[in-house]
Amino acid sequence: FFEANIELADPIPQFNLFDKNQVVYTRPRLLPPAKIFGTWLNHSVLAEGSIIHAKKIERSIVGIRSRIGENTEIAKTIVMGNDFFETIEEMMAADVPLGIGRECYIENAIIDKNARIGKNVYIRGSITLPDSETDTHCIRDGIVVVKKNAVIADGTRIGLGA
């Protein structure tokens, strides 16, 4: 799953979403296009409805309605996105708003839907990490998986170098 999705960001992946002979059928969501502010992007796919303020996104997939905060760096990661948008009032009232906060570093990870990742969070998967599981995340085959609807508090460190 992880490698197949990350490969979608390759110049010509094995499963090419732009190949007219390999049609992908989905339902229209009628979302606005992604908005990107000052982000360096390389070999990445961004879905509609996303608002991105990240410093850098490389070799990653960013799903629908994703929010990524300022100065965050993401590498070789699948961000599944969100099922809904939060209002400004909801974001201000939440301890940790929907999406990925500012000043985070995330590498070799899958961030499941509707996850809330606080500010200054460090997540780094590695094949050297043993499989493990907590209420908010698990590590399988070196990939850190943040669970659906999980809340990761500000300053949390997970994985290699934590």
Region annotations inferred by a language model:
Residues F1-A162:
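Left-handed beta-helix
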